[in-house]
């Protein structure tokens, strides 16, 4: 594994980041692994050099964070050896249930009143809960989405206070318009507060709209990209016609973000990923990850549900695509409308 600095900070992360959304409870989403299945995978990733782990409070309603914390204790992993990222914004069930991420915890009302969004109250309470579940501090606290109802200065002041408290070391953001991200950064600069060092956005071979504004802004301003779903929720990891996997059938995100917008362009790109993978004797996922890694200051977050896939992801760091191969993969791309899930 190779490591690089995250944004303009001194913090170094593994170039492939372990995505922990798939570690939690299958009661939340059918494709998610339970604790017993998840823990050995986290240990294996650590032993293979993936020392940066990304989770969120809403993943399996806190269970994912608990599993990350348990992995540290169970395998006696020194806290100083890993970088832990988590997120806040969405509501987390506090009754021990696992309601669907599409049905609850998205609106600041009812049982989730003041438990959704980025008000000062919710940020501080969410951070306290995450620290308790993880059993340790947070390296990078990310805002999962932008709360457009809360004053932006309130958001940035609260995030600054979290860092100053020591409960988080840095802050990052995820999935918003470039101009919105810039306004938040400008507020931090104007007040001498901590700035975001990372942007977790949706960027892969079949979703490249972030290349228009967000990515150029981030590179110009010293912010690293840590894209979520670099293999398009698995669509780039298997042939076009292969749609019988558990995740394909139980992850609503695939139908919303990928299948509902798929086009002949997507098919052409996926066919070329398969062709190039066969030519190089590697997996399709490795081609997609290598494409992401070919961009400056971009370190993809990859969900990995077997030890073999962890090994593949680690090996993908050594896969170097030529400029001609990159052009061949990108050539069929056709612009897409932004889905609300990306904002």
UniProtKB/Swiss-Prot annotation:
One of its GO terms (molecular function) is versiconal hemiacetal acetate reductase activity. It catalyses: (2S)-versicolorone + NADP(+) = 1'-hydroxyversicolorone + NADPH + H(+); (3S)-versiconol acetate + NADP(+) = (2S,3S)-versiconal hemiacetal acetate + NADPH + H(+); (S)-versiconol + NADP(+) = (2S-3S)-versiconal hemiacetal + NADPH + H(+). The record marks 87 as: Lowers pKa of active site Tyr. Keywords: NADP, Oxidoreductase. Disruption phenotype: Aflatoxin production is not inhibited, while the enzyme activity catalyzing the reaction from versiconal hemiacetal acetate (VHA), to versiconol acetate (VOAc), which branches from the main pathway, significantly decreases. Its EC number is 1.1.1.353. Substrate binds at residue 144. NADP(+) binds at residues 229-239. The active site is at 59 (proton donor). The keyword tRNA-binding does not apply. The keyword Oxidoreductase applies. Signal peptide: none annotated. Belongs to the aldo/keto reductase family. Aldo/keto reductase 2 subfamily. This is Versiconal hemiacetal acetate reductase. The gene is vrdA.
């Amino acid at each position: 594994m190779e490591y690089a600095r995250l944004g303009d900070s001194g913090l170094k992360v593994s170039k492939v980041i372990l995505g922990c959304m798939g570690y939690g409870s299958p009661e939340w989403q059918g494709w998610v692994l339970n604790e017993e299945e998840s823990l050995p995978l986290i240990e294996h990733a650590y032993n293979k050099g993936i020392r940066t782990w990304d989770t969120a409070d809403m993943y399996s309603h806190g269970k994912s964070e608990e599993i990350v914390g348990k992995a540290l204790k169970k395998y006696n992993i020194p806290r100083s050896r890993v970088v832990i990222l988590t997120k806040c914004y969405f509501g987390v069930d506090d009754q021990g249930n696992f309601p669907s991420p599409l049905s609850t915890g998205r609106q600041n009302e009812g049982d989730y009143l003041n438990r959704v969004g980025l008000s000062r109250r919710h940020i501080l309470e969410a951070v306290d809960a995450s620290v308790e579940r993880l059993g340790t501090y947070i390296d990078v606290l990310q805002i999962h989405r932008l709360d457009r109802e809360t004053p932006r200065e309130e958001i940035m002041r609260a995030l600054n206070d979290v860092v100053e408290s020591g409960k988080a070391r840095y802050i990052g953001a995820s999935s918003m318009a470039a101009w919105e991200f810039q306004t938040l950064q400008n507020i931090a600069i104007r007040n001498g507060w901590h700035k975001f060092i990372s942007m977790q956005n949706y960027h892969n071979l079949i979703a490249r709209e972030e290349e228009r504004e967000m990515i150029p802004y981030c590179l110009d301003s010293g912010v690293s990209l840590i894209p979520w779903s670099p293999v398009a929720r698995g669509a780039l990891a298997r042939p076009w016609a292969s749609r019988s996997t558990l995740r394909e059938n139980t992850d609503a995100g695939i139908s919303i973000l990928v299948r509902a917008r798929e086009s002949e362009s997507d098919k052409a790109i996926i066919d070329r990923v398969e062709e190039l993978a066969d030519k190089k004797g590697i997996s399709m996922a490795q081609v997609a990850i290598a494409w992401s890694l070919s961009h400056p200051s971009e370190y993809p977050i990859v969900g990995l549900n077997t030890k073999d896939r962890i090994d593949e992801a680690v090996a993908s760091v050594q896969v170097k695509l030529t400029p001609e191969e990159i052009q061949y993969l990108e050539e069929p791309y056709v612009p897409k409308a932004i889905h609300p899930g990306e904002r």
